[in-house]
């Protein structure tokens, strides 16, 4: 991304149902940190999505909950402690 002039990358709020704080993703976040590349976390595969189809609930409840799940995973797993200069948006 950096080589072609991009300033950030996007990742889903989970990868194949794995939280972003899982150890196999640490190298990705450390690399983004060292290159100064921002990471945009986009809600993906919302938990409980099939049960909340009415009233725009997937967008009003599901996406914020999924984003919170991803960020909490990064915080509580220690990724943000290990990658202190990582920019998440």
Name each model feature, range by range.
Residues 2-89:
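Catalytic pocket-lining loop regions of alpha/beta-barrel enzymes
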């Amino acid at each position: 991304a950096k080589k072609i002039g991009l300033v950030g990358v996007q990742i889903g709020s989970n990868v194949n149902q794995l939280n972003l704080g899982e150890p196999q993703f640490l190298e990705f976040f450390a690399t983004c940190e060292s290159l100064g590349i921002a990471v945009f976390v986009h809600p993906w595969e919302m938990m409980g999505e099939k049960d909340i189809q009415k009233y725009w609930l997937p967008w009003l409840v599901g996406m914020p909950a999924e984003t919170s799940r991803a960020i909490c995973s990064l915080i509580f797993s220690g990724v943000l402690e290990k990658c202190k200069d990582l920019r998440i948006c």
